[in-house]
């Protein structure tokens, strides 16, 4: 079997051996495989919006939205559909090809589902790919989302099965795998990855990748997050992750899942340009673009554009901002619009 063949039978030992290759050898191998499947100078750009923030009943130790921890985050109601569509338009003008919507729920409620489905339809009508992360899904809920036109569903495994109970106790690893199975059955694409730097060891990091790569079908999108430590969460004082270990994980993900988009997700604000460039060299080819990821900071849009220009990178499917002048105009509009994020449902109902 060749090194670049799509496999679903990876062992932990094989993943360890990849991770521990000399750094230059690992990046060379990852970049070579990357070039067989993707344009090395093209990056898929997504924008992420929190459509319902805070008071989540889950106890994920990394998350400021958990109702179990005092992080100072105020609970907000489900955003108006009009507000979501307006944000999606701005994202499209900034060059995003995919618009992702996240809600701090254990799973979507029946009363909120019609609003969520309408969000999908209206964002889809703008010509954007759509992605949602709403917690666990039953088969019928997944089918409803697929019928509404949802392209991707995000549901991360977060870490290895071995380390999982150190991070989350309110839902099981199997619960997460069942949701992924329901998403696949409904015909949607899967966005699934994890978080590095939560106190896990090397085997947990590569173990997560083994779990992902041995799914019946590789996730189309694999977000690799670097922990953003938030005051008030149990992980606020965890030891920092070595940047080279993070880059190694990106490279191993690329080798093990050669045709998946590997996304630099949360934690990019803590990465300098050189680290991000090495991640792109290691095979990352997707980012979240915009000033915020749900509730945590992200590099400013103009900083991302400057980095892209330095590296000669172009966004996938970028049609709305063909010139530098249009890019700068769209960014200015987005920054101005950011100051008006106050339109929430006035209804007395609140989503838990």
From Swiss-Prot:
Name the record gives this protein: Biotin synthase
UniProt cofactor(s): [4Fe-4S] cluster; [2Fe-2S] cluster
Enzyme class: transferase
UniProt record similarity statement: Belongs to the radical SAM superfamily. Biotin synthase family.
Catalytic activity line of the entry: (4R,5S)-dethiobiotin + (sulfur carrier)-SH + 2 reduced [2Fe-2S]-[ferredoxin] + 2 S-adenosyl-L-methionine = (sulfur carrier)-H + biotin + 2 5'-deoxyadenosine + 2 L-methionine + 2 oxidized [2Fe-2S]-[ferredoxin]
Pathway, per record: Cofactor biosynthesis; biotin biosynthesis; biotin from 7,8-diaminononanoate: step 2/2
SMART domains (alphabetical): BATS, Elp3
Subunit structure, interactors included: Homodimer.
Matching InterPro entries: Aldolase_TIM, BATS_dom, Biotin_synth/BioAB, Biotin_synthase, Elp3/MiaA/NifB-like_rSAM, rSAM
Domain Radical SAM core: 41-268
GO terms, molecular function: 2 iron, 2 sulfur cluster binding; 4 iron, 4 sulfur cluster binding; biotin synthase activity; iron ion binding
Role of this protein: Catalyzes the conversion of dethiobiotin (DTB) to biotin by the insertion of a sulfur atom into dethiobiotin via a radical-based mechanism.
Organism domain of life: Bacteria
Pfam families reported for this sequence: BATS, Radical_SAM
Positions annotated to bind [4Fe-4S] cluster: 56, 60, 63
Binding site for [2Fe-2S] cluster: 100, 131, 191, 263
EC number(s) given by UniProt: 2.8.1.6
């Amino acid at each position: 079997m060749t090194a670049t063949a799509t496999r679903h039978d990876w062992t932990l030992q094989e993943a360890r051996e990849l991770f521990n290759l000399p750094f230059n050898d690992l990046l060379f191998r990852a970049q070579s495989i990357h070039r067989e499947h993707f344009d090395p100078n093209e990056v898929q750009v997504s924008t992420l919006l929190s459509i319902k923030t805070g008071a989540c009943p889950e106890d994920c130790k990394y998350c400021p939205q958990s109702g179990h921890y005092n992080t100072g985050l105020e609970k907000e109601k489900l955003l108006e559909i009009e507000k979501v569509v307006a944000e999606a338009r701005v994202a499209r003008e900034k060059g995003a090809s995919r618009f992702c919507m996240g809600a701090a729920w254990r799973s979507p409620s029946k009363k909120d589902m019609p609003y969520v489905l309408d969000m999908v339809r209206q964002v889809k009508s703008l010509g954007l790919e759509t992605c949602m992360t709403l917690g666990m899904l039953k088969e019928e809920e997944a089918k409803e989302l697929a019928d509404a036109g949802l392209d991707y569903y995000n549901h991360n495994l977060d870490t290895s099965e071995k380390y999982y109970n150190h991070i989350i106790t309110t839902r099981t690893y199997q619960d997460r795998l069942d949701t992924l199975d329901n998403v696949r059955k409904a015909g949607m694409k899967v966005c699934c990855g994890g978080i590095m730097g939560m106190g896990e060891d090397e085997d947990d990091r590569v173990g997560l990748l083994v779990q992902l790569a041995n799914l019946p079908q590789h996730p189309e999108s694999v977000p690799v997050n670097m922990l953003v430590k938030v005051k008030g969460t149990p992980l606020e004082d965890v030891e920092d992750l070595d940047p080279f270990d993070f880059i190694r994980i990106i490279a191993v993900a690329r080798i093990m899942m050669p045709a998946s988009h590997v996304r630099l997700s949360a934690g990019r604000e803590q990465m300098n340009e050189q680290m991000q460039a090495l991640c792109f060299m290691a095979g990352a080819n997707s980012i979240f673009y915009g000033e915020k990821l749900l509730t945590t900071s992200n590099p400013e849009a103009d900083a991302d554009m400057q980095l892209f220009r330095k590296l000669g990178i172009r966004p996938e499917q970028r049609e709305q901002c063909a010139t530098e002048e249009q890019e700068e105009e769209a960014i200015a509009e987005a920054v101005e619009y950011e100051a008006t994020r106050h339109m929430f449902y006035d209804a007395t109902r609140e989503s838990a």
